[in-house]
Amino acid sequence: MKRINVLSEETSNKIAAGEVVERPASVVKELVENSIDANAKNITIEIKESGKDSIKISDDGIGIHPNDIEKAFMPHGTSKISLIEDLYSINTFGFRGEALPSIAAVSNVLLKSKTMDSDFGKEILVSGGRINHIKDTACNIGTVISVENLFFNVPAREKFLKSDRRESSLISNIINRLALANHNISFKYYTNNKKTLMTYASSDVKNTIRSIYGKNIYENIISFEEHSDIVSVYGYIGNSEISRGSRNNQSIFVNKRYIKSGTITAAVENAFKSFSTVNKFPFFVLFVDIYPEFIDVNVHPTKSEVKFQDERIIYKVVFDAVHSALSTSIKESFNINKDSIFDDKDTTYNLIQDETPKQEQVQIPIDLQNKRSDSIIENLPKFNPNVSYEKPKDSCRENCLNSIDINLKNTTEELKTKDIYYENSISASPKDNILCEKSQSKNIDNYNTIEAKFPRLNILGQFNKTYILAESLDTFYMIDQHAAHEKILFEKFKNQIENRDVISQILLTPVIIEMSAEDFAYYSENINIFHESGFVTEVFGDNIISIREAPMLLGKVSTKDFFLEIFDDIKNMGNGNIAKIKHNMISSLACKAAIKANHTLSYEEMNSLIEDLRYIEEPFNCPHGRPTIIKLTLKEIEKKFKRIQ
């Protein structure tokens, strides 16, 4: 029968060391964090043979009191906390008092330290957890600690270390993160007496980013910032040019502590998805400042994870900060001149019609997916790109109206369900129309408050039945008609769902769906998502539901397929990801309903599409991240033709 033994102090110390000291990078992290806690302004790290032979950390901090030198190597000896309640208001990196004794248990440690009030410093040598000597020494204010022969008494641990190159890479990685988190401190890092990194104290982390990652990263990052009552989020995110296939260049700091957080990473990447190609991960350096009582840092031996009291708040603040910054950055790149939104500075565009209009205003639907609309516009004058379109006079409007025979009753009744309305399409020239899907739900006066996100464009034509070509001043534009229409519909559907304005239509024949017991339970738990999306359902039997009404915005999309698509997202992502589920749902619907590539558009349809795009909230990327519109300046084109250098 096996008996219970009490482990010796030496054995228990080695076991405890295994929790804190996994590899040389762990030692560097713990010692540099101690220097930061000591209010150091300059920290030097010197590594030899990937840290296996020697690790030396020097700082100019406040030092260790001479009488506390020995206590520093005792288990749970710390100056950071004294009561259990202090755990809920921690503002330092260390607090357990485990680092130094754990490191000393598996290596030879020489520490020298001096405080400002002392005439001389103290030196202590600890080998394998045992103190060899403590004596006075001459040294500068601050602390110098050398760790040699790491794992000399634990050969099994040393055997599992990676190659020297890999271990050095891990050390560099942790030093980079510590330098980013503490950009107000100067860092010097030497590997085998060769300078590897040097940063200078700066109030802006962007300067430290340049020192670590280089000029290319520095020139392609965008700042973001968001605040709430309990948390502030700020930092930098890279644009799509520097996105990568891995998450290696992502850094999260909570109260300056480098951590890994699935919640924060998901928030950033979901915000980034709308502006970049799929399967790419963004570069970002993100700081979260939060009251200590709202987090728990004592949930992981290496403190690499924290627990938030309310992860939903954190997710929302991070998502909003990143999404807003990316959206603003793309918008600013188009350099819209508010003084010349309507092309001609000499012409004041009047959104409100004359008090005594010459003709009654009509709305003619233009179906971008159905050629039925061709019969409505077939008699329109052909568009000539060589002719400049000026605002017509009233007599011209009357002539245009009188020249085309339109049965208003039939037009409105037969095509009243079409998506896009082209107001005064018969009589108006391009400068007379605001062709926007918002016209279905907002009156003309409201357009005065809607800001155009890019200049009014002069349409040149269509290329490959897929891309609309246009110009404005000295800039050439190309618009992907599918991506543009998809984003217009996405914004429209999103607004309807968010505002709970989704109109449902009764199905002629209810759709019956049989489910397993597990699936039916998922459905029951998340029935509100379906109701908010415009579905009206009822239980039709054991694990059977009947869809009585479906959202009108579905159009020709299969009701059953779309319902099951939402359901699969709920199962795969969990009901904690409601925002992502709704985003996927709306983007999928918009993609299916939008006009496709290889579809010929008339001038009026192209103009209508572009005008709709100008006035939506975020017009520059489709929901899947592809650009809707790209531009080339005259200068860029002339460079291509070698006209200029």
Swiss-Prot record:
The alphabetized list of GO BP terms reads:
mismatch repair
Which key words are in the record?
DNA damage, DNA repair
**In the UniProt record, does the keyword DNA damage occur?**
yes
Work out whether the entry's keyword set contains Nucleotide-binding: no
| SMART domains reported for this sequence | DNA_mis_repair (SM01340), MutL_C (SM00853)
Among the GO molecular function terms of this UniProt record, one is:
ATP hydrolysis activity
| Gene Ontology cellular component list | mismatch repair complex
Described by its record, this protein's role is as follows: This protein is involved in the repair of mismatches in DNA. It is required for dam-dependent methyl-directed DNA mismatch repair. May act as a 'molecular matchmaker', a protein that promotes the formation of a stable complex between two or more DNA-binding proteins in an ATP-dependent manner without itself being part of a final effector complex.
- Protein name (database record): DNA mismatch repair protein MutL
Record InterPro entries: DNA_mismatch_repair_CS, DNA_mismatch_repair_MutL, DNA_mismatch_S5_2-like, HATPase_C_sf, MutL/Mlh/PMS, MutL/Mlh/Pms-like, MutL_C, MutL_C_dimsub
Q: Which PANTHER family match?
A: DNA MISMATCH REPAIR PROTEIN MLH, PMS, MUTL (PTHR10073), DNA MISMATCH REPAIR PROTEIN MLH1 (PTHR10073:SF12)
- Homology family: Belongs to the DNA mismatch repair MutL/HexB family.
